[in-house]
Amino acid sequence: MDPNTIIEALRGTMDPALREAAERQLNEAHKSLNFVSTLLQITMSEQLDLPVRQAGVIYLKNMITQYWPDREATPGDIAPYTIPEEDRHCIRENIVEAIIHSPELIRVQLTTCIHHIIKHDYPSRWTAIVDKIGFYLQSDNSACWLGILLCLYQLVKNYEYKKPEERSPLVAAMQHFLPVLKDRFIQLLSDQSDQSVLIQKQIFKIFYALVQYTLPLELINQQNLTEWVEILKTVVNRDVPNETLQVEEDDRPELPWWKCKKWALHILARLFERYGSPGNVSKEYNEFAEVFLKAFAVGVQQVLLKVLYQYKEKQYMAPRVLQQTLNYINQGVSHALTWKNLKPHIQGIIQDVIFPLMCYTDADEELWQEDPYEYIRMKFDVFEDFISPTTAAQTLLFTACSKRKEVLQKTMGFCYQILTEPNADPRKKDGALHMIGSLAEILLKKKIYKDQMEYMLQNHVFPLFSSELGYMRARACWVLHYFCEVKFKSDQNLQTALELTRRCLIDDREMPVKVEAAIALQVLISNQEKAKEYITPFIRPVMQALLHIIRETENDDLTNVIQKMICEYSEEVTPIAVEMTQHLAMTFNQVIQTGPDEEGSDDKAVTAMGILNTIDTLLSVVEDHKEITQQLEGICLQVIGTVLQQHVLEFYEEIFSLAHSLTCQQVSPQMWQLLPLVFEVFQQDGFDYFTDMMPLLHNYVTVDTDTLLSDTKYLEMIYSMCKKVLTGVAGEDAECHAAKLLEVIILQCKGRGIDQCIPLFVEAALERLTREVKTSELRTMCLQVAIAALYYNPHLLLNTLENLRFPNNVEPVTNHFITQWLNDVDCFLGLHDRKMCVLGLCALIDMEQIPQVLNQVSGQILPAFILLFNGLKRAYACHAEHENDSDDDEDAEDDDETEELGSDEDDIDEDGQEYLEILAKQAGEDGDDEDWEEDDAEETALEGYSTIIDDEDNPVDEYQIFKAIFQTIQNRNPVWYQALTHGLNEEQRKQLQDIATLADQRRAAHESKMIEKHGGYKFSAPVVPSSFNFGGPAPGMN
């Protein structure tokens, strides 16, 4: 492969006029031998200009991520392309050196490459990577250290989330590397250069990835942990050079000095929280936890108290450094040893560290004024919470006040002092209220405080709604949100809270205030019984305001608010549902205009999903109002059409849910017109969304069967989709759904003349069983398609089976099907599947001409019936139990005060520890099925797709059908009856009698229910025959 040709093509990709031809040239060449090796050579060549090398490394990265691993060919297809072994060998030989010697822009792409190579090749094909890393780590040439550490980091990252037993190749390698890393670090500590600190940071990142989820105790013992903890403390404690203060404050966290401190604290906080807290760790870490707490926890805490002191003294502190420091201190509150050391400082920390962090800041004000929408996004960003020092401060405050005596009392005293101080700085008032609101959960459980909270709201929060300062009005709403469960003694105070919040929502001129008001109003309505009635007259302007704010802010929290409000005010919302849906549809279209690569597109996607879910909620609220539903249908179809026609895959799930909601009561002609579009989308890019389409397809089949059968194209499309799923690579869950849909069609159309479809459906399902099946669910579901066909028409099914021929299968399909079915009868779970089995077996044994294979397995048939009926009895019992369970699962109100600990007590999470042990135990052993409720208590995942035989008013009763057929066989075909019963033992005969008894009871109960339903009387207890003499017709088998 000529490198110059590739170089010119890469250069061409940067020229808009040449790009298309250049990319075509590269795509034509990329499967050639040595192409990938040549790309790496180009990437490493210092003689070439950087843009060409960058283009080369990006193409190389794409090649490696796509084509490195071996891939199996699907049956009948040619083997897919993978990078030739000759090229792979060349890459493995040279990529480490490439990473070491490349500039940063190239190196970052190469580290992605080596990550993928290690993932697929280590240790089986590339043990040499360990030797290379060892060689360069031992080298005295410090210029190669950062590059080789990046390689080692990718090795460790590949094992970061693996179970301990899967990490042995990493542990073996780290036995050699960890001591070298420690020695290198100690050597670097005296070097004050940025490069030295960058290398230190990289070593910490390796250490963190090594211990984040599993602590390898064979690598880390008390001796080397002592050395590592000393290194970590040294880094946290050392001063950052003064010249860093010349850098803009927003840019300082990116400096290696602060990043190094951040990773040191990350490690310390992780070690303490996950492995070093006695009473809160799984048992394998018990000894380590005791050692860590006694030998290291207090010493580290002393260093971290110094960090907090520096922050108090107004020295600059990177936000993540402060956050991780507070996380470590928070962990220490729970242990007597660390608490004893922390206790003298806690009030100072609360007043001088936590309080300032919880006050409104200059940065907040700047953002509020310059970009209030970004301010809202930041305040509601859950990912921001994970890294925010304010959130860490809030957590520490809550832990200290809930777990340690006197802390809450002193904190509340401090806050009240600020709130009652005349002419107090409003920002300080904001901080005090922020602290009080953060403690709401504790305060509302403490007898001494909970009765005072209403007065606190009345005296210190209500007046803030008149403040000139927007952030104070927002804080007032926020506090009401957090105290929404206050027991108002005065109805007037509750009304005032609602009225002030409502006015903020509707009339306030500042958007962050409106957002806080919206959330506060909704939680007050949900938690205060009398609130709903008060807001009812204002529901239209409230809903309009919410819709407006959602459109303006595109905030996902508000879509949750409006959904809850719709459910609270379903009657009041119904008249304005069309207007609301139009507004939501317009907002949805606005939100999805954002391109996938634009900033904030992920947030917008979540908001768009929330909007679609809100429309779905509106549909459910108005489902009994046919004329409104029809109007909503037109609006929804526009939204559905937009998503499907523009192929916006990320909303397919919600769109199909919306379409399902529109077809639950009836399927309009417009909704039938949607089916061809759904089919087209499935064929193009919707293959992976079949399970999301399933509820809609189920409605097409069951809600409007007449139209389904009026035009053959409808059934053809649905069958074609199921067939494609069953023959493709959709995975077993989707295949189960496809088989289920075929079963539903067969049952729904019994007696409706789809005989010509049955062979196609059965072949599609049974052909799937000729290939590997991993789950019993798929095996039974495919069998169930044939069982349904048996119920539909036994002769048609047997003729179909006789005519089926599968490759590599000599045995007649009829024999194989029946044998497999009887062998797997214990795998049919839930109500529907067992009922289907019973009905299928009934149809089979009731045939006038008994298939030959049945004579061979006659002794298995009644035991199979008994097994199924036993399962059905349990399933019905569980179903009835769940029906009778109260829907109200709310916990009784908990007035228990949070238990505070004495200074010499540890907070031991016994439940959490027990839970960790259970998880560990479950991970190591398979569960057994001794407790039948596991299988019977819940309906199977596919049972939610009801069929015509599952309708409670449908007279298809499997008990009565079995009893009638069995009695018929006894009278009509004594030889067959004898063949079925001769092997039964006494217990089995008794169980058959019990089934007959239950059949009569169910018949009497059904008749009683029918008479009662039509205004008649209830039967008394039915008279049940005591002998094995069956009689009466069998409903449902005609």
Curated annotation (Swiss-Prot):
GO terms for biological process: innate immune response; negative regulation of osteoblast differentiation; positive regulation of odontoblast differentiation; positive regulation of protein localization to nucleus; protein import into nucleus. SMART domains: IBN_N. It is found in: Cytoplasm; Nucleus. The keyword Nucleus applies. One of its GO terms (cellular component) is nucleoplasm. Keywords: Acetylation, Cytoplasm, Nucleus, Phosphoprotein, Protein transport, Transport. Residues 881-910 are annotated as: Disordered. Induction: Induced by odontoblastic differentiation in dental papilla cells. The modification N-acetylmethionine is found at M1. The modification Phosphoserine is found at S886, S903, S1020. Its main location: cytoplasm. It holds the Pfam family IBN_N. Residues 884-910 have a biased composition (Acidic residues). Disulfide bonds: none annotated. GO terms for molecular function: histone binding; SMAD binding; small GTPase binding. Gene3D superfamilies: Leucine-rich Repeat Variant. The modification Phosphothreonine is found at T898. Forms a heterodimer with KPNB1. Interacts with histone H1. Interacts with H2A, H2B, H3 and H4 histones. Interacts with SNUPN and XPO1. Interacts with RPS7 and RPL5. Interacts with RPL23A (via BIB domain). Binds directly to nuclear pore complexes. Interacts with SMAD4 and NUP93; translocates SMAD4 to the nucleus through the NPC upon BMP7 stimulation resulting in activation of SMAD4 signaling. Interacts with phosphorylated SMAD2; the interaction facilitates translocation of SMAD2 to the nucleus. Interacts with SRP19. Functions in nuclear protein import, either by acting as autonomous nuclear transport receptor or as an adapter-like protein in association with the importin-beta subunit KPNB1. Acting autonomously is thought to serve itself as receptor for nuclear localization signals (NLS) and to promote translocation of import substrates through the nuclear pore complex (NPC) by an energy requiring, Ran-dependent mechanism. This is Importin-7. It comes from Mus musculus. The lineage of its organism: Eukaryota, Metazoa, Chordata, Craniata, Vertebrata. The gene is Ipo7.
